[in-house]
From Swiss-Prot:
Coiled coil: none annotated. Belongs to the CutC family. It comes from Escherichia coli O9:H4 (strain HS). InterPro entries: CutC-like (IPR005627), CutC-like_dom_sf (IPR036822). GO terms for cellular component: cytoplasm. Homodimer. It is found in: Cytoplasm. GO terms for molecular function: copper ion binding. HAMAP family: CutC. Keywords: Cytoplasm. It comes from the Bacteria. It holds the Pfam family CutC. This is PF03932 family protein CutC.
């Protein structure tokens, strides 16, 4: 049966995902940045309260995946922290200036991760040559690759995802970006073994008083009175679709 991973941005969302049938959580911060490393406090609270596998993302900033020496040092330290806290896996990825896997740095990450299952995230979708990259990731011992098939969403990239799945000795290919209940059957019919979804929506802040003349963001148009939350009903619906597909 296909595995359902839910992207969560808080301990509360991780619990919601678990309670509604998620098989695994990718734990992140900063949804508007596409997911950054969670704080130590969030990591500890999730580790204490969530019983399904949780894989934190290790990504020090938004933007591209070519990191400075200081950023890479932080990545290694965060990998060690996640390992010490007892998480079963993590999510990360590093590219070089030419859009290839930065093999020396990824080798250091794999050494720091030790027995943890490492997912190479959507840095894969920014790489120059996906099949060569897949070979490199297999050589590193990467457990799985999260990808949209190098398109803006995974449904558009499904043909590439199927090509990657068919590649000999490839890591597990997990489809993600825009995967929802209404299109999930396309991925299941294509033989995708793992799917990744945020399964959520922006929810209004409970704050009643709002100083509309002041922003804490560098983006003057940002809505600072909303937060992204996992929709438990959406998770349950996706899990039900997977179970019914398996029963066919």
């Amino acid at each position: 049966m296909a595995l359902l991973e839910i992207c969560c941005y808080s301990m509360e969302c991780a619990l919601t995902a678990q309670q509604n049938g998620a098989d695994r959580v990718e734990l992140c911060a900063a949804p508007k940045e596409g997911g950054l490393t969670p704080s130590l406090g969030v990591l500890k609270s999730v580790r204490q309260r969530v019983t399904i596998p949780v894989h934190p993302i290790i990504r020090p900033r938004g933007g591209d995946f070519c990191y400075s020496d200081g950023e890479f040092a932080a990545i290694l330290e965060d990998v060690r922290t996640v390992r010490e806290l007892g998480f079963p896996g993590l999510v990360t990825g590093v590219l070089d200036v030419d859009g290839n896997v930065d093999m020396p740095r990824m080798e250091k990450i794999m050494a720091a991760a030790g027995p943890l299952a490492v997912t190479f995230h959507r840095a894969f979708d920014m790489c120059a040559n996906p099949l060569n990259t897949l070979n490199n990731l297999a050589e590193l011992g990467i457990a799985r690759v999260l990808t949209s098939g190098q398109k803006s969403d995974a449904l558009q990239g499904l043909s590439k995802i199927m090509e990657l799945i068919a590649h000999r000795d490839a890591p597990i290919i997990m489809a993600g970006a825009g995967v929802r209940a209404e299109n999930l059957h396309h991925f299941l019919d294509a033989g995708v073994l793992e799917v990744h979804s945020s399964a959520g929506a922006w929810q209004a802040s409970p704050m009643r008083y709002r100083n509309q003349g002041l922003s804490m963001s560098s983006d003057a148009h940002a809505d600072e009175y909303s937060r992204y939350v996992v929709d438990g009903a959406a998770v349950a619906e996706m899990k039900g679709i997977i179970e019914r597909h398996q029963a066919k």
